[in-house]
Each structure stands twice: as C-alpha cells, then as structure tokens.
C-alpha cells in the first residue's frame, strides 16, 4: 500500500517525495561518517606506520581530524539544508529565555548526563570493555589534555558548535517537517550512534534527547548550544580533579541529579511534551527502512566497533 505523508505545515506529499528527501539525509550521513569519523582512524594509522615521519604523531593526527571535523560536518549538512529548504536563521534566532531558565535547563541536562556517564562507565567495566571516559563526535580523546589549548578549544567550543549546527540546527529542523516526535527520536538515535565510544552510548542518548527537546521548546539552537558548551567545560573541570578527591566529584554529581529530578517534576522546568502519532510512527519506519540511512547507521556502528577493538 502506498501512503501519502502529511507534513507539519499540513501539506501532503507523496511517498516518492519523502523517499528522495530521506535518501539525501542518508547520503549526507554517509559522507559525514566517512569523513568525520573514519578520517581520525586513517590519520592515526598512517602516522603511526611512518607515512609522515617528519611530523609529530599526535599533532598531525589531530590537525587532520580537526580539518575533517569542520569540512565533514558543514558540507553534508549544508546539502540537507538546501534540499529541505531549511531556514537556519530561524533556528539561530534569539529566544525569550532568561538566565534562570538557562540555569534550570543546564542543571537538568548536566545532572542526567553526568549520572548516565557514570552508570555507563560502570556497565562497560562490568562487561570488560575498555571505555573512553570523555570523547566527542569526530575527535576521540583517550584522555582530556587540559594543558593543550587546541584540545580544550575543540572539546569545549568547536565540537558543540558544529554538533548543534548539524544535529539540532539542520537535521532536527529539517525532519521536524514530518513531525516533532519523529524528528526528536531520529535525531537522538543518529546523534547517539555517531559517538565513538561504547562508554558514551547512554549519556550520548540522554544528551541528544534533552538538547533536541530544548531546541524544539525554544525553537532555537542558542539554549542547547549554551548548555552543550557549559556541559563540556564542566567535564573538563572534572578532569582537573585529582583522583584521590574524585569522591567530591561524585557527591557533586549526585546533588545535581537530585536537583535535576526535583526540577523535572516541578513546573519550573518548562520543556514541551512531545507525544507520538501514527504519522510520526509511519515516518520512523519509512526513515529506518531507507537503504542510505541503513548504510549510514551501519557505518556508525562499524566505527564504534573499530574504536573498541583498536582501543583508539
């Protein structure tokens, strides 16, 4: 049976039209995976095998990854934006949100993300999997080099900026035309799989879900960008805490988590509720059955497997 799809603007489009748009998304994600995700692995292997003997190994690998992160993110998602006719200016506009709302959103975000990161780390240890505690899409850190301004700039500012542009500014905004629930879930799944480490799967899902809901609530990526940057900065701050004082970090995270739970069940956490619908469920099935989307997701899974096996 052939279905027509109802878009958010009440316009009805054919299944072939939707297939073409979803195929473009899949192809863009494939390009993103091949350039942004696999380039660091290729650079590391090439440098370690002496193909560039005159260059310092870590620096060269990072420079190649840095360039790939920018090009591989901007180019494919620019294609998606043009095909969908997505107005990025509308999603980068100022919002009617005050400082108290920013702080509430951040406490909820970081409380749940930090707790998820801690739980996921325990699970990976029980499974005997060597997890990378802190990483970001495209560039993986075996440890946060807090004495390196370039690493810090990338982790705290560049990665959040590119991720919010790509996943919330372009992908979420574009897919929202077929329903907010559909866009929320698909963006969250893609964002989760795009992360490199098994030890980040649960926190990445929490991050993607909360940042996407925040963006849909305020119809702008500014709140999510601010929250993302502050979250990464605080993670770097935790990296500075000596191991013998790590108990204080856990206590701080526990307090934030309790406060986050209280805020969620109070009326102060003003995040919209997004329910599923038959059209969203149909769009999800159609999206996940697209061959290009499937290949892109498999590339993400393959990358995670390689990272785990190679202990990159």
Which residue ranges define each predicted feature?
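Alpha-helical transmembrane spans of integral membrane proteins, capturing the lipid-embedded, hydrophobic core
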Residues: 25-40, 66-74, 102-114, 118, ...
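Transmembrane helix-loop-helix hairpins at the membrane interface
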Residues: 149-308, 312
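Alpha-helical transmembrane segments in multi-pass membrane proteins
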Residues: 33-83, 249-255
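Membrane-interface segments at the starts/ends of alpha-helical transmembrane spans
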Residues: 18-24, 51-65, 138-146, 238-251, ...
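Membrane-helix interface linkers and caps
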Residues: 8-13, 51, 63-110, 125-127, ...
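Juxtamembrane helix-loop-helix connectors linking adjacent transmembrane helices
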Residues: 52-61, 89-159, 305-312
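Short, positively charged and aromatic/hydrophobic N-terminal segments
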Residues: 3-4
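Interfacial transmembrane-helix boundary/kink motif in multi-pass membrane proteins
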Residues: 8-33, 57-59, 86-117, 275-298
């Amino acid at each position: 049976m052939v279905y027509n799809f109802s878009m958010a603007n009440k316009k009805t489009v054919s299944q072939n039209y939707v297939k073409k748009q979803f195929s473009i998304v899949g192809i863009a994600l494939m390009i993103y995976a091949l350039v942004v995700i696999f380039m660091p692995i290729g650079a590391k292997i090439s440098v370690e095998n002496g193909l560039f003997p005159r260059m310092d190994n870590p620096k060269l690998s990072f420079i190649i990854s840095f360039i790939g992160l920018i090009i591989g993110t901007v180019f494919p998602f620019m294609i998606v934006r043009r095909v969908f006719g997505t107005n990025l200016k509308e999603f980068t506009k100022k919002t009617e949100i005050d400082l108290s709302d920013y702080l509430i959103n951040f406490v909820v975000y970081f409380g749940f993300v930090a707790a998820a990161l801690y739980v996921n780390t325990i699970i990976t240890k029980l499974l005997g999997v060597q997890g990378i505690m802190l990483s970001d899409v495209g560039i993986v850190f075996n440890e946060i080099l807090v004495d390196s301004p370039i690493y810090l700039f990338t982790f705290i500012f560049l990665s959040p900026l590119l991720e919010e542009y790509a996943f919330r500014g372009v992908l979420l905004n574009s897919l929202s035309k077929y329903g907010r629930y559909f866009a929320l879930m698909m963006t969250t799944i893609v964002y989760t799989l795009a992360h490199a480490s098994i030890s980040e799967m649960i926190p990445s899902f929490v991050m993607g879900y909360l940042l996407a809901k925040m963006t849909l609530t305020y119809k702008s990526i500014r709140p999510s960008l601010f929250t993302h940057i502050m979250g990464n900065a605080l993670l770097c701050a935790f990296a500075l805490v000596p191991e013998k004082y790590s108990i204080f970090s856990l206590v701080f995270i526990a307090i934030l988590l309790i406060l986050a739970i209280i805020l969620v069940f109070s009326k102060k956490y003003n995040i919209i509720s997004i329910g599923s619908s038959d059209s969203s469920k149909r769009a999800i099935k159609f999206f996940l059955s697209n061959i290009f989307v499937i290949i892109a997701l498999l590339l993400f899974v393959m990358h995670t497997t390689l990272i785990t096996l190679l202990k990159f």
